[in-house]
Design a protein with these regions (language model features):
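Extended basic (Lys/Arg/His-rich) segments that typically form rRNA-contacting surfaces
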Residues: 1-134
Length: 134
């Protein structure tokens, strides 16, 4: 199975979808922002093949960025982005620097793997349990 690059998005919420037989299926609604390829790592130079993507507008003040990030966004001629992620890909699935990706990158009926970052509310849940028990 070939490795293709991923996309960066944010979770909007959950809903349900009904198939043709009337069965309810739970779905997660995602907002996929435009992703821009900011760097390419090759097997010859780095020992592995990957693409670095930037997405989600957020950092308005360029002075708050580190110097290498300022140079990267200046070279790409785009506004600074909030998220920078690297995706390992096969050597033949690389794209050019500056290429943009959106939802059209996905194929119809394609299964996708999703990873997320939790904001960690475990301590809050623990305190709720303690307060409710007392």
């Amino acid at each position: 199975m070939s490795k293709r690059t991923g996309l960066i998005g944010t979770k909007i919420g959950n809903s349900s979808f009904y198939d043709d037989s009337g069965k309810s299926l739970p779905v997660t609604i995602l907002k996929i922002d435009e992703c821009v390829v900011s760097d390419i790592k090759t097997i010859e130079k780095h020992g592995y093949s990957s693409l670095q993507l930037v997405s989600i507008n957020g950092k308005n003040e360029i002075k708050k960025l580190k110097k290498p990030q300022q140079k990267m966004f200046a070279d790409l001629k785009i506004n600074p982005k909030k998220i920078i992620k690297e995706f390992r890909v096969d050597q033949d699935n690389t794209l050019d620097i500056g290429a943009t990706l959106d939802v059209s990158h996905l194929k119809t009926d394609q299964f996708v793997d999703v990873t997320s970052v939790s904001i960690g509310k475990v301590l809050l849940e623990l305190w709720k349990d303690i307060i409710l028990v007392d």
